Amino acid sequence: GSEMCIRDRQEDSELLDEVVVIGYGQVKKGDVTGSLLTVKPDELNKGKQLTAEDALVGKVAGVNIVPGNGAPGSGGTIRIRMGASLSADNDPLIVIDGVPVSNTSISAINPNDIASFTVLKDASATAIYGSRAANGVIIITTKKGSADGTSRPSFNYNGNMTVSNVYQYMDVLSTEEFRQAFAEHANAPETFKLGNADVDWQKEIYRVALGTDHNLSMTGALKNMPYRVSVGYTNQNGTLKNNNYERINASVGLSPKFFDKHLSVDINVKGSIENNQPVSTGVIGSAISFDPTRPVYEDYEGNVGLGYYTWMNSGKPITLAAANPVADLELADKLEKTKRSIGNIALDYKVHGLEDLRFNLNMGYDIQKNDNRENVPDLAPSMYTGNQNDGTGKRYKYHQTKRNTLLDFYANYDKELKDHHINVMGGYGWQRFWYKNNSVTTDTEGKELATPQHAEAELYLLSFYGRVNYSWK
Protein backbone atom coordinates (compact mmCIF):
# COMPACT_ATOMS: atom_id res chain seq x y z
CA GLY A 1 0.00 0.00 0.00
CA SER A 2 0.89 3.66 0.07
CA GLU A 3 1.66 5.98 2.97
CA MET A 4 0.82 9.65 3.44
CA CYS A 5 3.10 11.80 5.62
CA ILE A 6 1.90 15.15 6.95
CA ARG A 7 4.56 17.44 8.51
CA ASP A 8 3.99 20.48 10.66
CA ARG A 9 6.10 23.25 9.10
CA GLN A 10 5.68 25.70 11.97
CA GLU A 11 8.94 24.75 13.65
CA ASP A 12 10.90 25.03 10.39
CA SER A 13 9.36 28.46 9.81
CA GLU A 14 10.45 29.60 13.25
CA LEU A 15 13.98 28.41 12.56
CA LEU A 16 14.08 30.35 9.30
CA ASP A 17 12.92 33.52 11.10
CA GLU A 18 15.65 33.16 13.73
CA VAL A 19 18.14 36.04 13.69
CA VAL A 20 21.82 35.11 13.46
CA VAL A 21 24.95 37.23 13.78
CA ILE A 22 27.08 37.71 10.67
CA GLY A 23 29.84 40.13 9.76
CA TYR A 24 28.69 43.70 10.46
CA GLY A 25 25.07 42.90 11.13
CA GLN A 26 22.34 40.37 11.72
CA VAL A 27 20.08 38.53 9.28
CA LYS A 28 17.28 36.01 9.39
CA LYS A 29 18.58 32.50 9.17
CA GLY A 30 16.43 31.88 6.10
CA ASP A 31 18.14 34.75 4.25
CA VAL A 32 21.68 33.48 4.81
CA THR A 33 23.42 32.64 1.54
CA GLY A 34 26.81 31.47 2.83
CA SER A 35 27.81 28.53 4.99
CA LEU A 36 27.49 29.35 8.68
CA LEU A 37 26.44 27.66 11.89
CA THR A 38 25.48 29.19 15.23
CA VAL A 39 26.08 27.30 18.48
CA LYS A 40 24.08 28.54 21.48
CA PRO A 41 24.80 28.08 25.22
CA ASP A 42 22.53 25.07 25.67
CA GLU A 43 24.31 23.38 22.75
CA LEU A 44 27.84 23.93 24.05
CA ASN A 45 29.83 21.26 25.86
CA LYS A 46 28.89 20.78 29.50
CA GLY A 47 31.08 20.11 32.49
CA LYS A 48 34.66 21.28 32.84
CA GLN A 49 35.48 24.13 30.44
CA LEU A 50 38.87 25.65 31.17
CA THR A 51 39.00 27.73 27.97
CA ALA A 52 36.54 28.98 25.37
CA GLU A 53 37.85 26.38 22.91
CA ASP A 54 36.73 23.60 25.26
CA ALA A 55 33.09 24.67 24.84
CA LEU A 56 33.30 24.30 21.05
CA VAL A 57 35.03 20.92 20.73
CA GLY A 58 33.06 18.56 18.49
CA LYS A 59 30.10 20.92 18.07
CA VAL A 60 30.56 22.18 14.50
CA ALA A 61 31.21 20.01 11.46
CA GLY A 62 34.44 21.04 9.77
CA VAL A 63 35.80 22.82 12.85
CA ASN A 64 38.68 21.04 14.57
CA ILE A 65 40.23 21.99 17.89
CA VAL A 66 43.81 20.71 17.84
CA PRO A 67 44.79 20.12 21.50
CA GLY A 68 47.77 21.90 22.99
CA ASN A 69 50.50 20.13 24.95
CA GLY A 70 48.05 18.98 27.63
CA ALA A 71 49.17 21.47 30.26
CA PRO A 72 46.41 23.42 32.01
CA GLY A 73 45.63 26.65 30.18
CA SER A 74 47.47 25.58 27.03
CA GLY A 75 44.23 25.84 25.04
CA GLY A 76 44.03 24.52 21.51
CA THR A 77 44.51 25.56 17.91
CA ILE A 78 41.30 26.18 15.97
CA ARG A 79 41.12 25.00 12.38
CA ILE A 80 38.13 25.42 10.05
CA ARG A 81 38.12 22.79 7.33
CA MET A 82 41.75 22.16 8.35
CA GLY A 83 43.07 25.37 6.79
CA ALA A 84 44.31 25.88 3.26
CA SER A 85 48.06 26.45 3.39
CA LEU A 86 51.12 24.33 4.13
CA SER A 87 53.35 27.32 4.90
CA ALA A 88 51.17 30.34 5.70
CA ASP A 89 48.95 31.08 8.68
CA ASN A 90 45.91 28.78 8.93
CA ASP A 91 44.28 30.50 11.90
CA PRO A 92 40.68 31.67 11.50
CA LEU A 93 39.72 35.24 12.29
CA ILE A 94 38.24 35.55 15.79
CA VAL A 95 35.74 38.37 16.40
CA ILE A 96 34.53 39.03 19.96
CA ASP A 97 31.57 41.43 20.23
CA GLY A 98 32.65 43.10 17.00
CA VAL A 99 36.36 43.28 17.91
CA PRO A 100 38.76 41.13 15.83
CA VAL A 101 41.37 39.59 18.12
CA SER A 102 44.48 37.47 17.83
CA ASN A 103 43.94 33.70 17.69
CA THR A 104 47.00 33.05 19.84
CA SER A 105 44.62 32.54 22.72
CA ILE A 106 41.03 33.43 23.52
CA SER A 107 41.40 32.48 27.16
CA ALA A 108 40.64 36.10 28.11
CA ILE A 109 37.01 35.12 27.54
CA ASN A 110 35.36 33.15 30.31
CA PRO A 111 33.39 30.27 28.72
CA ASN A 112 30.51 31.12 31.07
CA ASP A 113 30.22 34.60 29.50
CA ILE A 114 29.68 33.30 25.96
CA ALA A 115 26.17 33.59 24.51
CA SER A 116 26.92 32.04 21.12
CA PHE A 117 29.53 31.04 18.57
CA THR A 118 28.83 31.76 14.90
CA VAL A 119 31.17 29.98 12.50
CA LEU A 120 31.48 31.38 8.97
CA LYS A 121 33.03 28.77 6.71
CA ASP A 122 32.91 29.57 3.00
CA ALA A 123 34.07 32.47 0.84
CA SER A 124 30.64 34.06 0.45
CA ALA A 125 30.16 34.23 4.23
CA THR A 126 33.67 35.44 5.08
CA ALA A 127 34.29 37.82 2.15
CA ILE A 128 33.08 40.85 4.13
CA TYR A 129 36.25 40.58 6.28
CA GLY A 130 38.63 40.38 3.32
CA SER A 131 41.74 38.22 2.96
CA ARG A 132 42.32 37.89 6.72
CA ALA A 133 39.22 35.66 6.82
CA ALA A 134 40.59 33.22 4.24
CA ASN A 135 40.62 30.47 6.90
CA GLY A 136 37.11 31.19 8.17
CA VAL A 137 35.65 33.39 10.89
CA ILE A 138 34.44 32.62 14.40
CA ILE A 139 32.16 35.31 15.84
CA ILE A 140 31.80 35.17 19.62
CA THR A 141 28.87 37.02 21.17
CA THR A 142 28.92 37.44 24.93
CA LYS A 143 25.93 37.43 27.25
CA LYS A 144 23.99 40.65 27.88
CA GLY A 145 21.56 41.90 30.48
CA SER A 146 17.84 41.86 29.69
CA ALA A 147 15.14 44.45 30.36
CA ASP A 148 12.42 42.06 31.53
CA GLY A 149 10.41 44.73 33.31
CA THR A 150 12.04 44.25 36.71
CA SER A 151 14.94 46.15 38.22
CA ARG A 152 15.79 43.41 40.70
CA PRO A 153 19.17 41.86 40.05
CA SER A 154 19.41 38.12 39.62
CA PHE A 155 22.49 36.17 40.63
CA ASN A 156 23.90 33.01 39.17
CA TYR A 157 26.75 30.91 40.51
CA ASN A 158 28.30 27.76 39.21
CA GLY A 159 31.44 25.99 40.22
CA ASN A 160 33.17 22.68 39.97
CA MET A 161 36.11 20.77 41.31
CA THR A 162 38.17 18.34 39.27
CA VAL A 163 40.69 15.63 40.05
CA SER A 164 43.14 14.60 37.32
CA ASN A 165 45.80 11.94 37.20
CA VAL A 166 47.82 9.97 34.69
CA TYR A 167 45.73 6.91 33.91
CA GLN A 168 48.58 4.80 32.57
CA TYR A 169 52.35 5.29 32.64
CA MET A 170 54.63 4.45 29.75
CA ASP A 171 55.67 0.80 29.82
CA VAL A 172 59.37 0.70 30.74
CA LEU A 173 61.70 -1.82 32.38
CA SER A 174 61.36 -2.22 36.12
CA THR A 175 64.51 -1.79 38.21
CA GLU A 176 64.99 -5.57 38.37
CA GLU A 177 64.47 -5.98 34.62
CA PHE A 178 66.87 -3.10 34.02
CA ARG A 179 69.54 -4.82 36.14
CA GLN A 180 69.07 -8.09 34.23
CA ALA A 181 69.39 -6.32 30.89
CA PHE A 182 72.47 -4.48 32.14
CA ALA A 183 74.06 -7.75 33.30
CA GLU A 184 73.92 -9.05 29.74
CA HIS A 185 76.22 -6.16 28.75
CA ALA A 186 78.67 -6.37 31.65
CA ASN A 187 81.49 -4.85 29.59
CA ALA A 188 80.13 -1.34 30.21
CA PRO A 189 82.75 1.17 31.44
CA GLU A 190 83.06 1.84 35.17
CA THR A 191 81.35 5.22 34.76
CA PHE A 192 78.07 3.52 33.94
CA LYS A 193 78.00 0.88 36.66
CA LEU A 194 74.60 0.54 38.29
CA GLY A 195 73.53 2.30 41.45
CA ASN A 196 71.79 0.86 44.49
CA ALA A 197 68.47 2.73 44.32
CA ASP A 198 65.05 1.58 43.12
CA VAL A 199 63.28 4.60 41.59
CA ASP A 200 60.21 4.80 39.39
CA TRP A 201 61.02 8.11 37.72
CA GLN A 202 57.55 8.52 36.24
CA LYS A 203 56.01 8.41 39.72
CA GLU A 204 58.54 11.01 40.82
CA ILE A 205 57.42 13.61 38.25
CA TYR A 206 53.64 13.05 38.24
CA ARG A 207 51.00 13.83 40.85
CA VAL A 208 47.25 13.84 41.42
CA ALA A 209 46.15 17.28 40.23
CA LEU A 210 43.28 19.26 41.72
CA GLY A 211 41.37 22.02 39.98
CA THR A 212 38.62 24.45 40.91
CA ASP A 213 36.46 26.79 38.84
CA HIS A 214 34.06 29.41 40.24
CA ASN A 215 31.81 31.81 38.31
CA LEU A 216 29.41 34.43 39.63
CA SER A 217 27.24 36.73 37.51
CA MET A 218 24.68 39.43 38.24
CA THR A 219 22.05 40.43 35.68
CA GLY A 220 19.41 43.13 35.91
CA ALA A 221 18.30 46.56 34.73
CA LEU A 222 18.67 50.09 36.07
CA LYS A 223 15.92 52.36 34.77
CA ASN A 224 15.56 50.25 31.64
CA MET A 225 19.32 49.95 31.21
CA PRO A 226 20.10 46.22 31.12
CA TYR A 227 23.40 45.20 32.65
CA ARG A 228 25.42 42.09 33.32
CA VAL A 229 28.46 41.81 35.56
CA SER A 230 30.46 38.63 36.04
CA VAL A 231 33.62 37.41 37.74
CA GLY A 232 35.36 34.08 37.44
CA TYR A 233 38.26 32.30 39.10
CA THR A 234 40.03 29.20 37.80
CA ASN A 235 42.90 27.33 39.43
CA GLN A 236 44.12 24.14 37.80
CA ASN A 237 47.17 22.09 38.73
CA GLY A 238 48.92 20.06 36.07
CA THR A 239 49.67 16.38 36.49
CA LEU A 240 53.37 17.25 36.23
CA LYS A 241 54.68 18.57 39.53
CA ASN A 242 55.02 22.36 39.85
CA ASN A 243 52.77 22.95 36.83
CA ASN A 244 49.92 25.33 37.66
CA TYR A 245 47.48 27.63 35.84
CA GLU A 246 45.47 30.40 37.48
CA ARG A 247 43.04 32.81 35.82
CA ILE A 248 40.84 35.65 37.03
CA ASN A 249 38.15 36.95 34.67
CA ALA A 250 35.80 39.91 34.95
CA SER A 251 33.32 41.43 32.52
CA VAL A 252 30.81 44.27 32.46
CA GLY A 253 28.09 44.74 29.85
CA LEU A 254 25.63 47.64 29.57
CA SER A 255 22.85 47.91 26.96
CA PRO A 256 20.92 51.20 27.36
CA LYS A 257 18.46 52.55 24.79
CA PHE A 258 17.60 56.19 24.12
CA PHE A 259 15.20 58.33 22.06
CA ASP A 260 12.28 55.95 22.23
CA LYS A 261 14.60 53.01 21.49
CA HIS A 262 15.91 54.57 18.27
CA LEU A 263 19.45 54.64 19.66
CA SER A 264 20.83 51.40 21.09
CA VAL A 265 24.15 51.37 22.90
CA ASP A 266 26.21 48.31 23.80
CA ILE A 267 29.18 48.72 26.13
CA ASN A 268 31.35 45.68 26.79
CA VAL A 269 34.52 45.47 28.86
CA LYS A 270 36.29 42.19 29.57
CA GLY A 271 39.50 41.63 31.47
CA SER A 272 41.63 38.72 32.57
CA ILE A 273 44.79 38.00 34.51
CA GLU A 274 46.53 34.69 33.84
CA ASN A 275 49.38 33.24 35.89
CA ASN A 276 50.86 30.20 34.24
CA GLN A 277 53.67 28.15 35.78
CA PRO A 278 54.83 25.94 32.91
CA VAL A 279 57.31 23.11 33.14
CA SER A 280 59.47 21.53 30.50
CA THR A 281 57.70 18.61 28.85
CA GLY A 282 61.17 17.21 28.17
CA VAL A 283 61.14 15.80 31.70
CA ILE A 284 58.71 13.13 30.49
CA GLY A 285 61.29 11.74 28.07
CA SER A 286 63.99 11.98 30.73
CA ALA A 287 61.86 10.07 33.24
CA ILE A 288 61.20 7.29 30.72
CA SER A 289 64.88 6.83 29.87
CA PHE A 290 66.56 7.61 33.21
CA ASP A 291 68.46 4.87 35.05
CA PRO A 292 66.08 3.48 37.75
CA THR A 293 69.05 2.42 39.92
CA ARG A 294 70.03 6.05 40.50
CA PRO A 295 68.66 8.01 43.46
CA VAL A 296 66.70 11.23 43.12
CA TYR A 297 68.95 13.05 45.59
CA GLU A 298 72.71 12.81 46.12
CA ASP A 299 75.36 15.22 47.43
CA TYR A 300 78.59 16.01 45.61
CA GLU A 301 81.70 17.99 46.41
CA GLY A 302 81.21 21.68 45.76
CA ASN A 303 77.41 21.28 45.93
CA VAL A 304 77.32 20.34 42.24
CA GLY A 305 73.71 19.48 41.34
CA LEU A 306 72.38 21.24 44.46
CA GLY A 307 71.67 17.93 46.16
CA TYR A 308 70.12 16.21 43.15
CA TYR A 309 71.63 13.18 41.46
CA THR A 310 73.83 14.25 38.54
CA TRP A 311 75.74 12.09 36.10
CA MET A 312 79.43 12.40 37.00
CA ASN A 313 82.73 11.28 35.45
CA SER A 314 85.98 11.73 37.36
CA GLY A 315 84.30 14.21 39.68
CA LYS A 316 82.86 16.35 36.89
CA PRO A 317 79.29 16.43 35.51
CA ILE A 318 78.70 14.67 32.19
CA THR A 319 77.30 17.34 29.90
CA LEU A 320 75.75 15.04 27.30
CA ALA A 321 73.70 12.96 29.75
CA ALA A 322 70.01 13.58 30.40
CA ALA A 323 69.43 15.87 33.37
CA ASN A 324 67.67 14.62 36.48
CA PRO A 325 63.95 15.18 35.63
CA VAL A 326 62.99 15.89 39.26
CA ALA A 327 65.71 18.52 39.46
CA ASP A 328 64.43 20.10 36.25
CA LEU A 329 60.93 20.34 37.73
CA GLU A 330 61.90 21.63 41.15
CA LEU A 331 64.79 23.98 40.37
CA ALA A 332 63.43 25.83 37.32
CA ASP A 333 61.30 28.78 38.43
CA LYS A 334 59.09 29.74 35.48
CA LEU A 335 56.17 32.16 35.35
CA GLU A 336 54.15 33.51 32.43
CA LYS A 337 51.88 36.38 33.44
CA THR A 338 49.32 37.78 31.00
CA LYS A 339 47.02 40.74 31.51
CA ARG A 340 44.44 41.36 28.82
CA SER A 341 41.42 43.55 28.25
CA ILE A 342 39.00 43.54 25.32
CA GLY A 343 36.21 46.06 25.03
CA ASN A 344 34.03 48.11 22.75
CA ILE A 345 31.20 50.60 22.57
CA ALA A 346 28.71 50.10 19.74
CA LEU A 347 26.03 52.60 18.70
CA ASP A 348 23.06 51.55 16.57
CA TYR A 349 20.86 54.45 15.44
CA LYS A 350 17.52 53.82 13.72
CA VAL A 351 16.80 56.97 11.71
CA HIS A 352 13.67 58.85 12.77
CA GLY A 353 11.17 58.94 9.93
CA LEU A 354 13.18 56.42 7.89
CA GLU A 355 13.36 53.46 10.22
CA ASP A 356 14.50 51.02 7.55
CA LEU A 357 17.85 52.84 7.64
CA ARG A 358 20.31 52.34 10.49
CA PHE A 359 23.73 53.80 11.17
CA ASN A 360 26.24 51.85 13.24
CA LEU A 361 29.43 52.97 14.94
CA ASN A 362 31.73 50.52 16.72
CA MET A 363 34.88 51.53 18.61
CA GLY A 364 36.93 48.81 20.25
CA TYR A 365 40.29 47.80 21.67
CA ASP A 366 42.36 44.75 22.55
CA ILE A 367 45.24 45.39 24.96
CA GLN A 368 47.57 42.67 26.20
CA LYS A 369 50.70 42.61 28.36
CA ASN A 370 52.93 39.59 28.84
CA ASP A 371 55.68 39.22 31.45
CA ASN A 372 57.61 35.95 31.39
CA ARG A 373 60.52 34.86 33.51
CA GLU A 374 62.69 31.80 34.02
CA ASN A 375 65.21 31.49 36.84
CA VAL A 376 67.58 28.55 37.24
CA PRO A 377 70.19 28.62 40.04
CA ASP A 378 73.91 28.05 39.69
CA LEU A 379 75.06 24.42 39.84
CA ALA A 380 71.65 23.05 38.80
CA PRO A 381 72.08 19.78 36.83
CA SER A 382 70.46 21.24 33.68
CA MET A 383 73.05 24.05 33.61
CA TYR A 384 75.89 21.68 32.73
CA THR A 385 75.78 21.86 28.95
CA GLY A 386 79.45 21.74 28.00
CA ASN A 387 79.80 25.44 27.15
CA GLN A 388 82.14 28.02 28.66
CA ASN A 389 79.56 28.96 31.29
CA ASP A 390 79.13 25.39 32.51
CA GLY A 391 77.18 25.30 35.77
CA THR A 392 76.22 28.98 35.59
CA GLY A 393 72.57 29.66 36.31
CA LYS A 394 70.40 31.98 34.27
CA ARG A 395 67.82 34.74 34.61
CA TYR A 396 65.54 35.19 31.61
CA LYS A 397 62.99 38.00 31.29
CA TYR A 398 60.58 38.72 28.46
CA HIS A 399 58.07 41.56 28.18
CA GLN A 400 55.56 42.23 25.43
CA THR A 401 52.85 44.85 25.02
CA LYS A 402 50.15 44.81 22.33
CA ARG A 403 47.62 47.54 21.65
CA ASN A 404 45.06 47.07 18.91
CA THR A 405 42.31 49.63 18.31
CA LEU A 406 39.51 49.82 15.77
CA LEU A 407 36.74 52.00 14.42
CA ASP A 408 33.94 50.74 12.19
CA PHE A 409 31.19 52.89 10.71
CA TYR A 410 28.55 51.42 8.44
CA ALA A 411 25.00 52.00 7.26
CA ASN A 412 22.38 49.30 6.86
CA TYR A 413 19.19 49.61 4.82
CA ASP A 414 16.66 46.81 5.28
CA LYS A 415 13.33 46.89 3.39
CA GLU A 416 10.49 44.46 2.81
CA LEU A 417 8.00 45.06 -0.02
CA LYS A 418 5.37 42.35 -0.19
CA ASP A 419 7.26 39.28 -1.38
CA HIS A 420 10.56 41.09 -1.83
CA HIS A 421 13.24 41.67 0.78
CA ILE A 422 16.39 43.69 0.20
CA ASN A 423 19.26 44.45 2.55
CA VAL A 424 22.09 46.81 1.63
CA MET A 425 25.09 47.47 3.86
CA GLY A 426 28.19 49.58 3.28
CA GLY A 427 30.88 50.89 5.58
CA TYR A 428 34.42 51.93 6.44
CA GLY A 429 36.86 50.28 8.83
CA TRP A 430 40.07 51.48 10.48
CA GLN A 431 42.38 49.36 12.63
CA ARG A 432 45.74 49.98 14.26
CA PHE A 433 48.02 47.17 15.42
CA TRP A 434 51.00 47.99 17.62
CA TYR A 435 53.33 45.82 19.62
CA LYS A 436 56.68 46.01 21.38
CA ASN A 437 58.70 43.26 23.01
CA ASN A 438 62.10 42.82 24.57
CA SER A 439 64.00 40.04 26.29
CA VAL A 440 67.25 39.65 28.20
CA THR A 441 69.17 36.63 29.51
CA THR A 442 71.77 37.03 32.25
CA ASP A 443 73.54 34.90 34.81
CA THR A 444 72.59 35.06 38.47
CA GLU A 445 74.87 38.08 38.97
CA GLY A 446 73.43 40.09 36.07
CA LYS A 447 76.07 39.41 33.40
CA GLU A 448 74.53 39.08 29.94
CA LEU A 449 74.66 35.57 28.50
CA ALA A 450 73.06 36.51 25.17
CA THR A 451 72.41 39.63 23.11
CA PRO A 452 69.26 41.40 24.36
CA GLN A 453 66.38 41.26 21.89
CA HIS A 454 64.02 44.12 21.03
CA ALA A 455 61.29 44.52 18.43
CA GLU A 456 58.58 47.09 17.76
CA ALA A 457 56.08 47.39 14.92
CA GLU A 458 53.01 49.39 13.97
CA LEU A 459 50.53 48.43 11.26
CA TYR A 460 47.29 49.88 9.95
CA LEU A 461 44.36 48.29 8.17
CA LEU A 462 41.91 50.45 6.21
CA SER A 463 38.92 48.89 4.53
CA PHE A 464 35.77 49.71 2.63
CA TYR A 465 33.16 46.99 2.53
CA GLY A 466 29.65 46.36 1.38
CA ARG A 467 27.01 43.68 1.00
CA VAL A 468 23.71 43.33 -0.86
CA ASN A 469 21.19 40.60 -0.04
CA TYR A 470 17.99 40.11 -2.01
CA SER A 471 15.36 37.46 -1.43
CA TRP A 472 12.00 36.73 -2.99
CA LYS A 473 9.37 34.55 -1.39
What are these regions (language model features)?
Residues 144, 221-224, 258-260, 349-353, ...:
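Outer-membrane beta-barrel strand-turn architecture
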Residues 147-198, 239-243, 249-342, 360-463:
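Surface-exposed loop/interface segments of Gram-negative outer-membrane beta-barrel transport/assembly proteins
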Residues 28-29, 64, 432-442, 469:
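Proline-centered turn/helix-capping motifs that create local helix->coil transitions or kinks
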Residues 2-272, 279-280, 342-343, 449, ...:
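Short, small/polar-rich motifs associated with maturation and membrane association
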Residues 362, 465-473:
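Exposed, low-structure sequence patches enriched in small/polar residues
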Residues 357:
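Surface-exposed interaction regions that form or flank ligand-binding interfaces
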